[in-house]
Amino acid sequence: MFIMGKITSAIITPVLAAGSTTSPYLFQVNITQRLCHSSCIGLQPSFFPIFSFKEISKVADNQYMVRVHLEGTIVYVPCDGNECCTKGQLISQDFSIPVASVNTPTSVTVEGGTPVNAIVGQPCQKCSRTFVSEAPLSLTIA
């Protein structure tokens, strides 16, 4: 959806991996972004997000909020072009991960892994504006 000439923010959802109960915590981060242009569903987009730690804040006793910055450019083939004519769309925004700890955290490290990217659409659809990425993220808290 366009809002005054701007594309909406990405939806970023970190999900804690089953069995990840101590630091380093492993998350799967789902990133969903509406693209500026329709893209060919059959051609995989390129996107490698870079995660960086921004801050940690105390929200209650033994409860903290870690703010992480995500940045990367989605490179994709628009439906009205050819493979030699790609488009790029930047994602640069923050998201938060809640943390419970009896000890006050003194350091936080984030590290991203190799994502799986796709353009998703309805069956038999050739083009879509919905980009989805699943990216692993390791969060070390000391």
Spans of model-derived segments:
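Viral structural modules
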Residues: 1-142
